[in-house]
Design a protein with these regions (language model features):
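Alpha4 helix (beta4-alpha4-beta5 surface) of REC/receiver domains from two-component response regulators
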Residues: 72, 93-109, 117-121
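A Lys-centered signature of the CheY-like receiver
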Residues: 112
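Receiver (REC) domain active-site loop signature in two-component systems and cognate sites
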Residues: 65
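Two-component/phosphorelay signaling modules centered on CheY-like receiver
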Residues: 20-38
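Active-site beta3 strand of CheY-like receiver
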Residues: 54-60
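Non-catalytic signal-transmission and effector/linker regions of two-component phosphorelay proteins
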Residues: 1-12, 115-132
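Acidic catalytic/metal-coordinating carboxylates
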Residues: 41-45, 69-73
Length: 132
């Protein structure tokens, strides 16, 4: 569990999913364990945010979204910041080529729905990789 700094959270995570129910769930789970979650319902909006001055410890994104999917979002985000840790979530992993997902630069790929234990694993892997 993350300790909160005085007046705020220690880590800020961008969560991208076109399903608002998933965004609410992820935000609630992350905030309960001391992370700040910024949620957006499109990869285009997430890309716009990443181009700004706000920085994030990591990104957790859905793969199957309209217009810009998670795979192409990851490629664009890695161009903006090659060190940004990005984790994919999808209920439709069978629709994707795992090699292509790994080549895009994802730091982890998980099937929805994720458990609290899997979320903890994502956070631990992301934080450890951030420290490297």
């Amino acid at each position: 569990m993350q300790e909160k700094k005085s007046g705020g959270y220690t880590k800020k995570i961008l969560v991208v999913d076109d399903q608002r129910s998933q965004l609410k769930l992820m935000k609630k789970m992350l905030e309960r364990i001391g992370y700040m979650a910024v949620t957006v319902d499109s990869a285009e909006e997430a890309e716009y945010i990443l181009r700004g001055e706000e920085s994030f410890s990591m990104v957790i994104t859905d793969l199957k979204m309209p217009w810009l999917d998670g795979l192409n979002f990851c490629k664009k985000a890695k161009i903006l910041d090659p060190n940004l840790k990005i984790f994919a979530l999808s209920g439709f992993l069978y629709d994707f080529d795992m090699n292509e997902l790994e080549d895009a630069g994802f730091d982890g790929i998980y099937e929805k729905p994720i458990s609290k234990a899997q979320l903890a694993e994502i956070l631990n892997v992301g934080i450890e990789k951030t420290r490297d």
